[in-house]
């Protein structure tokens, strides 16, 4: 069963390259959770990518170069230029279902707290949301530390996430709650619910 009309996917699945932490940190109540875990030992199966790629309102899948054999051909790649040196990669690729040429986002991570070893910047995910204008709900089925949902909260978009790891789930909930308490001044807030009266 596929996603229904209005749903889009913005996600960063496990790449299957063993990038699952290992710094020994484990404190989900506020700080780092980068403890040794086994979430990045295998890629999700091909059926998962077929399901994600068919999202009616569009799909953006980070690490798409690791899944090129599991996804349809695309010209609409997104590229994040990290502006970092050393042993790390210069950038990352996202597969998309959109039409059009490659688009580049140049952004250097700040010293913001990293709670997940492959955590993306909120600014990057906010940029991605601009490529999903028709989406009513954004799904991140590999939610991790919740960056996609934080971006949705800040941009006034509806987001839903799925995360199997309880530590990362707790962190994601905390980060989304914090984003909800610090609304973006340039995004119109959602109207408060109004209780209707019953006419007799």
Where are these regions (language model features)?
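Class I S-adenosyl-L-methionine-dependent methyltransferase catalytic core
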Residues: 1-139, 145-200
């Amino acid at each position: 069963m596929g996603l229904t009309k209005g749903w889009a996917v913005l996600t960063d699945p496990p790449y299957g390259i063993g990038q699952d932490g290992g710094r020994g940190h484990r404190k989900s109540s506020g700080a780092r959770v980068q403890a040794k875990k086994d979430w990045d030992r295998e890629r999700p199966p091909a059926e998962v990518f077929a399901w994600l790629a068919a999202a009616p309102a569009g799909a953006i899948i980070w690490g798409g170069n690791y899944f090129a054999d599991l996804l349809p051909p695309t010209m609409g790649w997104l590229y994040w230029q990290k502006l970092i040196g050393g042993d790390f990669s210069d950038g990352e690729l996202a597969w998309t279902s959109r039409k059009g040429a490659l688009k580049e986002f140049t952004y250097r991570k700040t010293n913001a707290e990293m709670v997940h070893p492959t955590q993306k910047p909120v600014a990057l995910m906010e940029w991605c949301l601009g490529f999903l204008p028709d989406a009513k709900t954004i799904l991140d089925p590999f939610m991790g530390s919740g960056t996609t949902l934080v971006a949705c909260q800040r941009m006034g978009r509806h987001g839903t996430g799925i995360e199997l790891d309880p530590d990362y789930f707790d962190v994601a909930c905390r980060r989304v709650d914090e984003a909800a308490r610090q609304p973006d001044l340039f995004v119109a807030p959602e109207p408060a619910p109004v209780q209707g009266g019953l006419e007799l």
